[in-house]
Regions:
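Glycine-rich phosphate/pyrophosphate-handling loop used in enzymes and phosphotransfer proteins
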Residues: 1-218, 222-252
Length: 252
């Protein structure tokens, strides 16, 4: 039997734990009042169980089905002749002024890295349900130049990759570095984009990648120039295969 002293000690411990929990709940409610958690699309307040996007906006996302034909779709056709193409997939259809562009803009320019992780987790769950989990050994993101990453504070593609990594249960690794600072790809022709990123990426020194099956991720696939340049560095470094996945691609 426990002595009165032990019982009293347990009571004090429980009481302190309870008071601490109440304080944490108070401060959380206070912070939610001052800095409310809102859905980045509809701006409505999020419920406790909603991580980043509200349930309604999740249901309205322009989801693509490239993963149903990963070897033969409009994305693989776009990259034919640039690299040895395996699977090329994307979570969302991109449309100008649409939800996908809105999310990408807020992810990249409005300091909302959590959007990338949430989209990665969502897409990872979709891929897991469709039997993709055992296809890759590692998830790798197209890196930003250190100067650009320091200015933004994070790499949006890395956040997407880490979300995918968690849902698929495979490691995330920074296998690539961007050794040259390049101009933005926006408003460049396809040839100009290819030239702009030529020999931009290289492997992290001393990191073995021989025979690895890599899922290379980026935020958006337009001409595919950046992804192809990064994939080439991985393949030349010894990767067994490189599949490509992006948050958004194509048009609608």
């Amino acid at each position: 039997m426990q002595s009165n002293g032990q019982i009293y000690g347990l009571y004090i411990h429980w009481r302190l734990t309870y008071l601490l929990a109440m304080q944490l709940f108070f401060w959380k409610d206070f912070l939610d009042l001052i800095f409310p958690r809102n859905c980045p699309l509809c701006k409505q307040a999020l419920f406790e169980f909603e991580a980043c996007l509200c349930t309604v906006c999740k249901g309205l996302l322009p989801r693509a089905n490239f993963h149903l034909r990963p070897f033969d779709n409009e994305l693989t056709s776009k990259l034919q002749g640039l690299i040895p193409v395996h699977r090329v997939i994307a979570f969302l259809h991109f449309s100008k002024n649409g939800r996908s562009q809105n999310l990408l803009h807020q992810l990249k320019y409005k300091n909302q890295p959590e959007i990338g992780e949430e989209l990665g987790r969502m897409y990872g769950s979709t891929l897991d349900l469709n039997g993709f989990s055992g296809l890759w050994d590692v998830v790798v993101a197209v890196p930003l130049h250190p100067r650009k990453k320091a200015r933004r504070g994070y790499n949006q593609s890395e956040r997407f990759g880490r979300g995918l990594s968690k849902s698929l249960g495979i490691p995330y690794s920074e296998l690539l570095v961007r050794r040259k600072f390049t101009d933005t790809q926006t408003n460049k022709s396809r040839l100009e984009r290819l030239t702009n990123v030529e020999n931009v990426f290289e492997l992290q020194p001393g990191v073995p990648i021989q025979e690895l099956r890599v899922l290379l991720v980026d935020d958006i696939l337009t001409t595919g120039a950046t992804l192809c340049a990064a994939a080439t560095a991985l393949l030349e470094g010894g990767a067994k295969l490189v599949d490509l996945a992006t948050i958004a691609a194509g048009g609608r």
